[in-house]
Amino acid sequence: MEKDNLPDASLTSNQLQKYAEDLAKVYQSEREKSKDLEAANQQLLKYADDLNKTVLELKEAYLDTIHRLALAAEYKDEDTGEHIIRMSRYCALIAEKLGLPAEEVKNILYASPMHDIGKIGIPDTILMKTGKLTEEEFEIMKTHTIIGANLLAHSRAEILQVAEQIAISHHEKWNGTGYPKGLSDDQIPLVGRIAGLADVFDALTSRRPYKEPYPIEEACEIIKKERGKHFDPDVVDVFMENIDEILKIKEEVDSADNALRSGFARSVRD
């Protein structure tokens, strides 16, 4: 082989050195990029954590506002704070045992306290009357369902949409003799059927200025007798199957301190 055909060793060495230097620069650049990416990632994680905390605070403020609106509707009722917590938790338990998805259970938990928000529009002379209402007064009282639904209508918030359904339908009856529309059977939204039973049970078993609470056994008998009349049979069955849990909720709320009662979002979450 002739000498001229051999590769220039010095040239090859220079090229290899240049390649090595270039690779080192690329490696260093990638290391710096990796550090920058890691720093950016850590910053994003911090932003995400801060955002999650802000969202949680906003949600709790939103739920607390809902609770206070519900309280405003029944402000003169000394038991209303306990009532809306008990009733909402009864609703959530029934919904869960009926097999509703977790998100729907949460919605009814947070929406049901607004079932009587329309009472804001009912005159105190009727709302606070301790004796039996006249026929005319009762017709006025019944309008709280429509007033409540109107107050809650046209919201894009899912919880308020559920609350609207409950407000308008929780006094409907399975046999069609309820109000305001005289709906029957499955015409009544499920959330209204659930809230209607929970509301009646809590009213029966709670002390009011005009009555003593019914004994639990008697209240349960009334609920069972109204199966297929006032109440959805399936809702009654689930309610009675889980009466021990219902009574546990009642005991927890009745024995809770004032701090627990004042924080609805915290109370229902616990």
Predicted features by range, described:
Residues 1-45, 49:
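N-terminal membrane insertion elements
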